[in-house]
Amino acid sequence: MKTNKYVEELQAKSTTELNETLVAAKKELFNLRFQNATNQLDNTSRIKDVRKNIARIQTVISQKAKAAN
């Protein structure tokens, strides 16, 4: 599945790379919300996808933090 490959890619990244990816995803979500509010967003399901990706990134960061302890 597509999500499994995405999670595997995330798990291969370092913590700093994950944090950079998280910041980029949050910026994208911010922009998507503004586009949605101004009726410029055609694909509204993209908001849901980005939110789920943010959760996946945060989960991998949490797993790496627990493994480090």
Curated annotation (Swiss-Prot):
Q: List the Pfam families hit by this protein, alphabetically.
A: Ribosomal_L29 (PF00831)
Q: Tell me which UniProt keywords the record has, alphabetically.
A: Ribonucleoprotein, Ribosomal protein
Q: Name one GO cellular component term.
A: cytosolic large ribosomal subunit
Which residue spans adopt a coiled-coil conformation according to this UniProt entry?
none
> Among the record's GO biological process terms, what is one?
translation
Q: Superkingdom of this entry's organism? A: Bacteria
Q: Name one GO molecular function term.
A: structural constituent of ribosome
Signal peptide from the UniProt entry:
none
**Matching InterPro entries, A to Z?**
Ribosomal_protein_uL29, Ribosomal_uL29, Ribosomal_uL29_CS, Ribosomal_uL29_sf
* Family annotation (PANTHER family): 60S RIBOSOMAL PROTEIN L35/50S RIBOSOMAL PROTEIN L29, LARGE RIBOSOMAL SUBUNIT PROTEIN UL29C
Q: Which family does it belong to?
A: Belongs to the universal ribosomal protein uL29 family.
- HAMAP family assigned to the protein according to its UniProt record, in alphabetical order: Ribosomal_uL29
Return the protein name: Large ribosomal subunit protein uL29
Please report the organism this UniProt entry assigns to the protein: Lachnoclostridium phytofermentans (strain ATCC 700394 / DSM 18823 / ISDg) (Clostridium phytofermentans)
The gene name on file is rpmC
